[in-house]
């Protein structure tokens, strides 16, 4: 086990590159939506942002989540290091608690205007594919890591649980942002156990009522239990508009514009309280029927 934990950076990088390659090939072979912006523009800038984020993170924090979990185990910090529970139970419960913590963190970034200024860069992507799942402002990455380290210190989860969670979260973030086509029957059942691309795409709708839904990155249960789940976008997956209203030009997709986006324009328009919007009966019926049957869009799939 020590060897696996010591090889954490290499394992995470290998998993990341493997899943990214699979998603990229899948997007080319079976895209869900038509691509209007040249891939080279978005992918070059989104991937450059990953390099910047990773460098800043490594320079800022001497240890990350897995390393802190190892220290917590050695020093008896956190809840699970004070309880006598089987390792398998501690691993499973820790991964569940870490996942709901990430869900709540995501909600927080939508609820607080200053944090939304950072997070909206992720939403301002004008298309939705695997690299969208990598597009986060460096300051958001730093704040997220502080939050994650605090959760790890409080819980004291087994280090292997944190490693598994990080690898799975990275993989599912690439998967559920991918522009890939799944058979309707597969999506209908899969979204009960993992956030699917069709489920998460709703969250990237330009409509604030849909933006403030489907916060889960990994497990879909929290959205369903806490009332933030929307089954399908009102305009359908090939008809919906991706992004936010403030930043709609191709120039906004370049990294220099992305990095200064938090200080550009107001942070209004996507307040979390809009998630309490009461849908018309027609939309509620559509969501209910779509969730049961997952009828594909009437538009031809690209």
What is the role of each PLM region?
Residues 51-64, 79, 85-239:
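Membrane-embedded catalytic scaffold of the fatty acid hydroxylase/desaturase
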Residues 41-54:
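Alpha-helical transmembrane segments and their helix-start/interface "positive-inside/aromatic belt" motifs
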Residues 11-21:
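Structural signature of hydrophobic alpha-helical transmembrane segments
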Residues 235-302:
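Cytosolic-facing loops and C-terminal tails of multi-pass membrane proteins
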Residues 63-73:
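Membrane-helix interface motif
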Residues 25-44:
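Membrane-interface helix-loop junction between the first two transmembrane segments
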């Amino acid at each position: 086990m020590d060897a696996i934990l010591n090889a954490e950076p290499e394992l995470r990088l290998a998993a990341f590159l493997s899943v990214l390659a699979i998603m990229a090939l899948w997007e080319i072979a079976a895209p869900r939506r038509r691509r209007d912006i040249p891939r080279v523009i978005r992918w070059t800038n989104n991937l450059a942002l990953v390099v910047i984020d990773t460098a800043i993170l490594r320079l800022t924090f001497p240890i990350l989540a897995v390393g802190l979990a190892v220290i917590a185990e050695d020093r008896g910090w956190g809840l699970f290091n004070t309880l006598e529970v089987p390792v398998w139970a501690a691993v499973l419960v820790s991964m569940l608690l870490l996942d709901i913590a990430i869900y709540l963190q995501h909600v927080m970034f939508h609820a607080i205007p200053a944090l939304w200024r950072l997070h909206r860069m992720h939403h301002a992507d004008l298309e939705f594919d695997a690299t969208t799942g990598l597009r986060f402002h460096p300051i958001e990455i730093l704040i997220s890591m502080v939050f994650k380290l605090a959760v790890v210190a409080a819980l004291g989860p087994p280090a292997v649980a944190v490693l598994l969670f990080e690898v799975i979260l990275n993989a599912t973030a690439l998967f559920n942002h991918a522009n890939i086509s799944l058979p309707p029957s597969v999506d209908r059942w899969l979204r009960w156990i993992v956030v699917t691309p069709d489920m998460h795409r709703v969250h990237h709708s330009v409509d604030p009522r849909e933006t403030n839904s489907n916060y889960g990155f990994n497990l879909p249960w929290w959205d369903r239990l806490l009332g933030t789940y929307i089954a399908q976008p009102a305009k359908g997956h090939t008809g919906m508009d991706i992004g936010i209203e403030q930043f709609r030009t191709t120039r906004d997709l370049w990294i220099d514009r992305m990095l200064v986006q938090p200080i550009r324009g107001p942070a209004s328009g996507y307040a979390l309280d809009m998630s309490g919007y009461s849908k018309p009966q027609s939309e509620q019926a559509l969501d209910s029927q779509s969730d049961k049957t997952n009828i594909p869009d009437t538009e031809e799939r690209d």
